[in-house]
Regions:
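Hydrophobic alpha-helical connector segments
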Residues: 59, 70-102, 147-151
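Short alpha-helical scaffolding segments that buttress acidic/His motifs in well-ordered protein cores
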Residues: 89-92, 106-110, 151, 155-158
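Hydrophobic/aromatic-rich alpha-helical bundle segments in the mid-to-C-terminal region
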Residues: 119-128, 139-194
Length: 194
C-alpha cells in the first residue's frame, strides 16, 4: 500500500522551521541546513518542496501574512464593527512568547522588503489591507474613515514598542482600546446631533 503524504503538512513544518531560524538569526541566517535542523527534517525534504532559499523565504512571507489574516478572521467571528476594529488593531501586539517570535519574524520580513521587491509587494499589500479594513470598519460603524490610517499606524508603533520591550503589552492594548472607545463615543455624539 503506498504511503499517503500530507504535502501541506510537510510544507508547514518546513515553514515553521524557517521562522524559527529567522527569529534566532534573521533572514540572512537562513540556509537549508539550518531550517532542516530547526524543523527536525532532512535537507532533501526541503529541496523537494523549495528550489532555492529565496523561494523558501518568499513562501514563509506569504504564509505569515496568510496565517495572520486567517487568525484575525477566526477571532472576529460574531463581533460587531467596533469589536472587529479593536481585534484588528490589538492582534499584532505580542502578548505571548510564541507570538513575540511571530512578530519578530514579521519585522525581519519588513526589513527584507527594502531589498526584495517580491517581499515588498506582499508586505505593502498586507499593511495597506490593514489600513483599508480599519477604514471599512469605521465606515460600517458610522465613524469618520479618516481615522483608519491613524489607528493602523498607532497599532504598528505600539507593536514595535512592545517588541523592543519599551512598553508592556497590556498598556499597548489599553491605549488602542481607549482610542477606539473615544472614536465610538464621538461617533455616538455625531449621530445624536444629526
Amino acid at each position: 500500500m503506498p504511503k499517503i503524504v500530507d504535502h501541506h503538512q510537510r510544507r508547514t513544518e518546513i515553514i515553521w522551521g524557517l521562522w524559527a531560524v529567522i527569529s534566532e538569526r534573521g533572514i540572512e541566517g537562513v540556509t537549508f541546513q539550518a531550517v532542516a535542523r530547526a524543523a527536525g527534517i532532512s535537507v532533501g525534504r526541503i529541496q523537494h518542496y523549495f528550489a532555492s532559499k529565496d523561494e523558501l523565504v518568499l513562501a514563509g512571507c506569504s504564509a505569515i501574512v496568510d496565517g495572520a489574516s486567517t487568525e484575525h478572521e477566526d477571532r472576529s467571528t460574531g463581533l460587531d464593527a467596533w469589536e472587529v476594529l479593536i481585534e484588528l488593531l490589538v492582534h499584532p501586539i505580542p502578548r505571548t512568547p510564541e507570538f513575540r517570535i511571530g512578530v519578530s519574524v514579521w519585522y525581519a520580513y519588513l526589513v527584507r522588503a527594502f531589498v526584495d521587491p517580491r517581499i515588498a509587494e506582499i508586505m505593502r499589500s498586507a499593511i495597506r489591507g490593514t489600513r483599508e479594513e480599519a477604514e471599512e470598519l469605521l465606515r460600517l460603524a458610522g465613524a469618520p474613515v479618516i481615522h483608519g490610517a491613524r489607528l493602523a499606524a498607532l497599532s504598528q508603533g505600539l507593536t514595535q514598542q512592545v517588541l523592543t520591550g519599551a512598553m508592556d503589552p497590556d498598556e499597548a492594548v489599553t491605549i488602542l482600546e481607549a482610542e477606539v472607545d473615544h472614536l465610538r463615543s464621538e461617533s455616538g455624539a455625531l449621530e445624536t446631533r444629526s
